[in-house]
Every structure is written in C-alpha cells, then in structure tokens.
C-alpha cells in the first residue's frame, strides 16, 4: 500500500495549479471576468480571499494525509471508516423498514414514498453545502456537525406520533446521514491515490456483508409492528459511538501534522475567519454556498415531486388547490432558479466550466439514473415480497438487502483488479448493462410464491452490476479533476444521486398511489376491505392469510402495479448505458488527483479513450469505396 503515498503532497504545496484556479484567486491575472464567462458580476476581493482560504484548507489536508503515510496507520484509518460504515449501514438497512411500519401505524403506508421524496430533496440540497463548507472549515468539523444532525433527526422520528412529525425528523436525519457519508467519502479520497481510491471508498460498504444476514434477525426480534419507536430511537446513541474511532483518528492525524515544519510554515497564512471574524465570513459564505440557489432548487423539487405522491390513494385529489398550488409553484421556480444561477450567483450550484465537460455531465447523468432506477424497481419491493410473495419479515429483509451484499462481497476483488487495469470505463459500461438484465428479471418475477428464486437471482445480478459502476463513476470523475475541485465534483455527483432518488420516489409513489387502490377495489369489490388493504397492508395480511381469495386479489393488484414500476426502470436503463459510453477514461495513477491541468481548463481533457475512439471509427468500417 506504499503506492498510496508515493507522492509527498507537502513538496508540491508551491505548485498549486488547481485547474487554472490561480486566475480566479489572483485578481491581477483574472483577465476574463465572470461577466464574460457566466454573465455574472465580478467577484469581490473578499470573496476571492475566501476562495483562497479553500486552498489553504486543501494544503492542510494534504499535510494531515502525509502524517498517516505508514501502512499500519492507513489500516487504522480504514478500520475506523469500516466501523463508522457499520453504524450507518446497519441503521440504513433497517430504518427504511421501520419507516414502513411507522407509516402503517399512522394508517398512512402509501405516504412512504412521500417521506422518501422529502428525504431525497433535503439530501440533495445538503450535499453541495457540505462539500463547500468542508473546503472552508475542514473535514472534521463538518463530520461532527453531520453526526449531531443525525442524532437530532433520529430522536424526533422515534417520538413522532403522526406522519408529519416523522417527516420533520427525517429532514434532520437525512441532512446528517448524507453529510456523514459524503464527508467520510471525501476523507478517504483525500488520503488515497487514484489507483487505490476505489478500494478505500469501498471500505465503509463492507459491513453490508454482515448486515445482510443480521438485519432480518434484528427486525423480526425487534417486533417493529409494536416497537418501531424504540427500534428507531436506539440509534441516537449507537451511531455516535460508531463514529468515535474515525473522529479520534482525525484528531490524531492533526496532532501529528501540527508537529511538522510544513504545518508551521502554513501558520503564517491566516484563514479568512481569523482575519475578518464571524459576521463577515457569514456574508461571504452566503455567496459561496449559493444559499438562494440551494433554497430555490430544494423548494422547486419539493413542490413538484411531493404532490405527485399525495394526489392518489383512496380518493384522487388532483382538484385540491392545496396540491395544485405547490405543484404549479414548483415549475414557476425553475426559470427563477435559472435566472439566479446565470445572472447573480457568484458560485453556481452547477459551475459551467466543470459541468460542460463530458467527464462531469455524463457521470452526473449516471448518478441521477442510479437512484431513479433503484427507487422505481425497489421502492415498494419489501412490501411486495411480504404481501405478494408471502415472504416472512426475516426473509424479506434479507432478500431486500441482497444486492448490497453481493455488491459488497465483490467489491474488494474488483478494487484490487482496478489497481492493475487502471481503467474504469469498460467495467462501468458492463455494469450498466447488467442493471438492464436485472430489471428484466424483476419485471418477470414480481408476485406469487414462484417468484422467490427469481427475485433472488435478479438482486444478485443487480449487485454485481452495482459493484462495477456506482462507486467507479465517482472515482472516474475524480480522476479527471484536481484536488481543489475533487470535493465539488463528488458533491455534484451525489447531489444528482439524491435528486434521482427524489424523482424516482416521486414517480414510483405516483404510480403506486394513483393505481394500487383502484386495482385492489377492482379485484375485491368491497370498499371497506379495499381501503383496509390499501392503508394497512401488514395488518390486513395477518387476517387474510396466504391462499385466501382476498389475499389473492391483493397479490394480483400488487403484481399489476409492480409491473408498471419495473417497466419504467427497464426503459431508463437505455440512457444509463448511453451516459456510460460518454464518460472519459483517464488512467488511474499513484497521485491523489490530477496535478497539472492547462490554464483556463477545469478538467483534464488529454486522456486516452480507446472505447470512444473505436465507436468514432466504427462508421468508417462500413463505408464502401466505388470501384
């Protein structure tokens, strides 16, 4: 593992040519102003000073990383990341199940997708803020802040006695959850070379190997039908305990780094906060975080997507002004967001100079489709297995997490293979193709006891495909930019990932709520019975066991709706494969990030892409010359 730190970042600290950032940080050399590039106002000296503070944090991060250049210290770091991943991974594995029981206890099970949409919108808005703040204040402080939000949200959810309060807790919980995952991912990226980056990023996912088998036992013994409140609440102290090792690890890194001469050399450089104080930094952070843009994006997404999940059910309510108003407002906010980002934002959510390159926009497209397709196929898969396949709680929990298990088992072998191949694009394309195969299998096996083996097979294929492209997409785009912009492109990918989950949950929920009740009523013919089956399916199946006419009617209704869900997922696998073809294919090296990028460029465009070259030459092979 010595190759991870074959380059001493401290020796390179005078060579910070971060994607032409010296043109932005130095007003004298910044000839082409933002007015020319974006149609934005000229950046102020104070704002540039805050941007320069980000480079100071990056330099400090590199010195901290060099303090852990021994293999055993790297092993301690990875073990700490594993323990942290175990905490949020196990909680994530079972909390979505408890959410289903919570909504069912409120007789609002169909609002599961509404909560998922709210979660995803909050998550998407949080990603950008976390990434930009981490470059100003450092990774550790943001990580601790995320843990606090996680705990607060967990406590609120555990004490909620209606779906509105549960959703409010979900806002805090998800803001913390995505922050922990993103900052942990950035920390591991800071301390690994591109060649070993995938292995490091896989480490927090490895607990799924254990969690897949114990999650079912936990949920069945916890009796979530009765005790879901305590089952959620106990994570308010379990998860922070799992974060203690990584926090201690980061503190130890800083302690070692502070004793180095390189760190003392940086002491002469004051941060923006040290020079200007709290009030002025708040004013400048308002522009750096693009607070207005983030709020407009979150409000627009929420106003459009949440009504889609609320308008159906026992009674269609599209004629209700309380739904129509927010829905229309969401679309009205889109042009307002565009005008703000183009004319007024100093640091736009989507920085054009980054996003315009295919390395970035194609990876963002894939990130969006990953979660969109996932939620279309799996949003109600657990419920389908319980109600329409007659799985037990333990079995359904294990099967629902099977794709994660397979993906995790394959990940270390694949990551080691990548260190030898040093190319990711062929694997990404093959992984996207496997997802299409998995969606086809889920379409075929969607109800009846005979679907048990088919669903397991589909999720295994899904898991292998997940290994080959979900995390590699992030590493692919990181390998095309400098260290200065690594957190930004990582956050952009994860923001689109969360937006994909929001849209996927909304579309999935819209199909479910608009269709399911009508199908149940059509097959049962009894309004009271159909209403009970729709609103509280877990309670209904305890009364009407497998094989009864009422249960068969409910099973067929679930099969019909799940068919629509998987068709949408299958169709969107086509653009997923198309985006994978558009990726760049940079060679993975022993450096933390791309070190030299031409002035004025934000992405390394001098990569060799054999796959795209082959496709470009393909038409010439079928041309015929006239004799």
Swiss-Prot record:
Keywords: Cell membrane, Endosome, Ion transport, Iron, Iron transport, Membrane, Transmembrane, Transmembrane helix, Transport. It is found in: Cell membrane; Endosome membrane. The chain crosses the membrane at residues 71-91, 111-131, 136-156, 168-188, 198-218, 232-252, 291-311, 324-344, 368-388, 399-419, 425-445, 455-475, 564-584. InterPro entries: MFS_trans_sf. Residues 1-70, 132-135, 189-197, 253-290, 345-367, 420-424, 476-563 are extracellular. Its main location: membrane. It is a multi-pass membrane protein. The keyword Transport applies. GO terms for molecular function: siderophore-iron transmembrane transporter activity. One of its GO terms (biological process) is siderophore transport. GO terms for cellular component: cell periphery; cytoplasm; cytoplasmic vesicle; endosome; endosome membrane; fungal-type vacuole; nucleus; plasma membrane. It comes from the Eukaryota. Residues 92-110, 157-167, 219-231, 312-323, 389-398, 446-454, 585-627 are cytoplasmic. PANTHER family: GLUTATHIONE EXCHANGER 1-RELATED, MAJOR FACILITATOR SUPERFAMILY. Belongs to the major facilitator superfamily. Involved in the transport of siderophore ferrichrome and so has a role in iron homeostasis. This is Siderophore iron transporter ARN1. It comes from Saccharomyces cerevisiae (strain ATCC 204508 / S288c) (Baker's yeast).
